[in-house]
Amino acid sequence: MIIPAIDLIDGKVVRLYQGDYGQQTTFDLSPQAQLQSYQDQGANWLHIVDLTGAKEPAKRQTTLIAELTAGLSANIQVGGGIRTEEQVAELLSLGVKRVVIGSLAVKEPELVKGWFNKFGSEAICLALDININQSGEKIVAVSGWQSGGGKSLESIVEDFSQVGLKHALVTDISRDGTLTGANTELYRELSSRYPDIAWQASGGIATLEDVAAVRDSGAAGIIIGKALLINQFNVAEAIQCWPNE
């Protein structure tokens, strides 16, 4: 499945290179119009990242996210700076279908497991951003990639499997924003090892060939941000390559 994405800083559509706030590109686009266009081209799911909130949780762009969600009929998945049960509940009450939890799942797993028990595994997606070291270990980074987490991807997945983990978005940081192609070997390995989890691929998508390669890897969906913003291809073409379920 194709999941078009936009990243937001202070209400503007942006892209970061490898998660670095110092390497930001701002696009002269309306977030609402951009998401509406993606929906009109056939997207059933849309992914919104609140980068302001990810960096400074007190400045989460909840009002904007509420407006965006209200104006769209597609399913919305939202991440960035979510730290409390109240924030999860608020987003779900605004009509967001799934919240994306990153750093906190690594730092405070018991807290986040409680949210799975309260809201259900369909309502939460874990975002695991990984650095693959020379030994091939998949180490999860935390805090908007500004610091290393030290835990392996597998250890986190196995921990959260106890509460019914269903959705996980995995980004190979070395590919993010690079347009060098996705790490399809990674998604092939994960979907074969953990077939009950719907893996979302992210990072490096540049061409429809990349989309097809991820489709064939066993991943359940693909997050596409930069490639759409710079018109490498459009959502309709991507869905033609990988139709909605």
UniProtKB/Swiss-Prot annotation:
GO terms for biological process: L-histidine biosynthetic process; L-tryptophan biosynthetic process. Disulfide bonds: none annotated. GO terms for cellular component: cytoplasm. One of its GO terms (molecular function) is 1-(5-phosphoribosyl)-5-[(5-phosphoribosylamino)methylideneamino]imidazole-4-carboxamide isomerase activity. Its main location: cytoplasm. It is an enzyme of class 5 (isomerase). It catalyses: 1-(5-phospho-beta-D-ribosyl)-5-[(5-phospho-beta-D-ribosylamino)methylideneamino]imidazole-4-carboxamide = 5-[(5-phospho-1-deoxy-D-ribulos-1-ylimino)methylamino]-1-(5-phospho-beta-D-ribosyl)imidazole-4-carboxamide. Its EC number is 5.3.1.16. The keyword Cytoplasm applies. Belongs to the HisA/HisF family. This is 1-(5-phosphoribosyl)-5-[(5-phosphoribosylamino)methylideneamino] imidazole-4-carboxamide isomerase. It comes from Shewanella sp. (strain MR-7). The gene is hisA.
